[in-house]
């Protein structure tokens, strides 16, 4: 965009999807350090908050899952009084005015339930909500979006990344995330089950603009983020990182 004699950069939207345990959330947080005026929208945490609330209320999820194709996720979100805010450039989730910490949202129980419900729910209104949210924040920020089905939610993504890693590496990373408290075989089954559900729902779909980034050999999140940043135009990145 031109304003007078100056060239004004338009804010960009970067979509980060990935296989379970490939480290997309950590990569998003690292990208904040290298993409000026950026924020993270964690789409997955909205779903996790919904499932967390339902689990906490003692609702029978098996009964809910049988009728999920008729359920409007956005209306559930409103009934549970789930709201989203940006704090310290990251997504904060509130349920009935109370902030929910990341550890509760990322629990193994919630994650599997999210995968099961997300594959069969009617997401149209939630996608519409996400689209408006991205447009709203893009007016002021470069937006890094983490989640599933991002090309359906926001087809005009400037970049769409699919983060992959080997199954063994993903198990290793998830084990660290859960402080080695979960049996490795249980973790393997959990990840494989979630992979099956995601693939069945078409969440690992590769589009023409999708850039697949394998981070199996990356020693740390900084190396993973650097691999992602290598595909982003230099004018959108902190100059120091490009040297």
Residue spans for each PLM region:
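The conserved Walker
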Residues: 20
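Hydrophobic positions on the alpha1 helix immediately C-terminal to the Walker A/P-loop
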Residues: 27
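Small-molecule kinase domains that catalyze NTP-dependent phosphoryl transfer to phosphate-bearing small molecules
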Residues: 76, 85-90, 127-139, 147-157, ...
């Amino acid at each position: 965009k031109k304003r007078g004699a100056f060239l004004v950069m338009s804010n960009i939207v970067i979509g980060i999807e990935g296989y379970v345990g490939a480290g997309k959330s950590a990569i998003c947080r690292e990208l904040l350090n290298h993409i000026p005026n950026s924020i993270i929208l964690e789409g997955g945490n909205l779903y996790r908050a919904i499932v967390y609330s339902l689990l906490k209320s003692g609702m029978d999820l098996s009964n809910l899952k049988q009728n999920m194709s008729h359920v409007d996720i956005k209306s559930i979100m409103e009934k549970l009084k789930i709201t989203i805010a940006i704090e310290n450039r990251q997504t904060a989730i509130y349920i009935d005015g109370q902030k929910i910490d990341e550890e509760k949202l990322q629990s193994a129980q919630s994650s599997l339930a999210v995968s099961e419900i997300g594959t069969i729910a009617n997401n149209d209104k939630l996608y519409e909500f996400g689209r408006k949210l991205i447009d709203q924040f893009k007016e002021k920020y470069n937006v890094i979006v983490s989640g599933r089905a991002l090309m359906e939610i926001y087809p005009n993504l400037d970049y769409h990344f699919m983060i992959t890693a080997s199954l063994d590496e993903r198990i290793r990373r998830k084990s660290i995330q859960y402080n080695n408290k979960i049996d490795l075989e249980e973790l393997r089954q959990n990840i494989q089950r979630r992979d099956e559900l995601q693939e069945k729902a078409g969440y690992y779909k590769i589009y023409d603009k999708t850039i697949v980034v394998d981070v199996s050999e990356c020693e740390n999140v900084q190396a993973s983020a650097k691999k992602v940043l290598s595909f982003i135009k230099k004018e959108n990145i902190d100059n120091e990182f490009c040297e």
